[in-house]
Amino acid sequence: MSDKEGETALYNDREEEARQFFSDSAEPQSQGGSNELAVNENEDNNNDEVEDDADENIYSIQAHKITGDEENNREVTMKKNVRKAKKYDEFKNERDEQGFVPMGENPEYGGMDYSNEDPQARKRRLLEEKMESAIKSKTSRRRRADEDDLERMQDDRIDFLKDQMIKAANLDVEKNSQGQIATEKLKLLNEVVDILSKADLAISILDNNLLEAVRLWLEPLPDASMPAYQIQKELIHSLTVLPIKTDHLIASGIGKVLVYYQRSKRTEANLKKVVDRLIGDWTRPILNKSDSYKDRTIQFNEYNKNRFTNQLSSARRSKPKEAKSLYEESAERRKRAAIPAARTTAYKIAPKVDPSLLRRQQLNSNGNNDERFKRINQKLTSMNFKKKSSKKSGPSIEGRNLTI
């Protein structure tokens, strides 16, 4: 037998002995020396390379020495990889250092204990939870950043428009004081109306105090002339859409300008109705008044015809001459007659009627009323009788009432 065949037989015999040794019992047997727990540092590189998943779970390598033949006088070390899972305490400490709390141990999810869970199942579960938490945190951060960017863009847009409006108002004031035509606000009116009509910008408009620029646009010019009617109409109608609160009124001061429009005789009638409604809506919360008609309190006062006539005549004599509207002024300038315009009158005091006085008046006038009623009734009945008698009589087409 050659040397090569002898080495092969020796290797097979030793391999069979090692396999029988590991299959007989789990406890190491002492054979020519004590079993020891160690890592063979002189092992070849090919035997050291292990997969990443296996390296995470290998914590010890159990080695057993098997004596060889006396002729060769060498020993073969057979190694058994003992794979152990991490202890729960070590895993928990490592997880706490990373700042990660799995859903299973979160009190919000019941606080379940996974200490006896299979290592592979635990590893898979933790990986899934990390991925879910990472995805949720990234999306939430991205959403918040987008919202902040959008709000910042809206604020910048409102601030830029506010600066433009203030600049245009100042230029119109300068031109009006110099006797020139003020047209800067009219050039910018379409852009301002476009911004004020957008519902998604309402909060940004109020927070950035764009109402201050609106107040400057509605204020009279230095020569006491009103702004262009188109500016008045568009801006005042846009105020009805905005959710204006008391704080916004105080910061902007726009309420004073609308009171001026309410009391001015040069304000157009339909526009004055809108102004009255706005002022009523704004002052009602300040005065703690309800907008329900049922909660409305009406003031009553006794009505005396003679005294009221005397007061009315004296008031007419002492009343100053009313200011003319723009339409009346233009008609007078062209020497034309102006169509009378309806005046908005609001009555705040209701007359108090005495029921007993009404009864006495009714009793005193019953006689005259009865005679008058009889005459009218007789006249109506006679008119009806004449109509009936005037109807033509004779045979009909069908031959009814025909005498043969």
UniProtKB/Swiss-Prot annotation:
Molecular functions per Gene Ontology: chromatin binding; RNA polymerase II complex binding; RNA polymerase II-specific DNA-binding transcription factor binding
GO CC term, one of those recorded? RNA polymerase II, core complex
Q: Where is the composition biased (Acidic residues)?
A: 41-56
* Positions with biased composition (Polar residues): 22-34
Biological process according to GO? nucleosome assembly; poly(A)+ mRNA export from nucleus; regulation of transcription by RNA polymerase II; regulation of transcription elongation by RNA polymerase II
Describe the location of the TFIIS N-terminal domain by residue ranges. Answer: 212-289
Query: Cellular location of this protein?
Result: Nucleus
Give the start-end ranges of region Disordered.
1-57, 313-343, 382-404
Which keywords does UniProt give here?
Nucleus, Transcription, Transcription regulation
Entry's InterPro entries? RNAPII_TF_IWS1, TFIIS/LEDGF_dom_sf, TFIIS_N
Pfam family, any one: Med26
Bias regions of kind Basic and acidic residues — which residues?
1-19, 320-332
Could you say which protein family the record assigns here?
Belongs to the IWS1 family.
Spell out the PANTHER family in the cross-references.
PROTEIN IWS1 HOMOLOG
Its job: Transcription factor involved in RNA polymerase II transcription regulation. May function in both SPT15/TBP post-recruitment and recruitment steps of transcription.
Q: What is this protein called?
A: Transcription factor IWS1
Species of origin reads Debaryomyces hansenii (strain ATCC 36239 / CBS 767 / BCRC 21394 / JCM 1990 / NBRC 0083 / IGC 2968)
